[in-house]
């Protein structure tokens, strides 16, 4: 029986996905976007055949509170077996740009509320939590860094508390700077370039491997 993997998040996850129904025959080709969810699906479908279904419900611009507002329709009702979440950069960005962000304590509160709700409704679900990441150039100001570090600490702590797989993307990206400069991995300090998406996909598959057997 096929298992369902659901990707949730913001524009990094969305990555231009077509807004079509998951029952549409074109969903797998167009509905996963052009980023790391598509790359993960491609790798697993190549290696594992039809063991998995893949859904991408990332929405550009989302903060953690936006996830919460749409969670029943876009997560609970889909009843995924594996849930992957990458959220947090807009919680900072929206505050810096227009004072409509989500401060770190409330970010943690809503993140935990999401997972509590999910586990109550889907107690057998497996969780993969990706830490938010930035590089300090272009769209990312120096005043982002401390807050971004705090959000990463929050996600790491939540992953530990909930027994989730944790994917430490910031350290992975930092290590990648030994290979190529930051612009090779992220276009504007936030959004991944093709190599950045591949890096995320590879890290996800490696970290989540115990859940895929």
Ranges and model annotations:
Residues 1-57, 72-79:
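Serine-esterase "nucleophile elbow" of acetyl-processing enzymes
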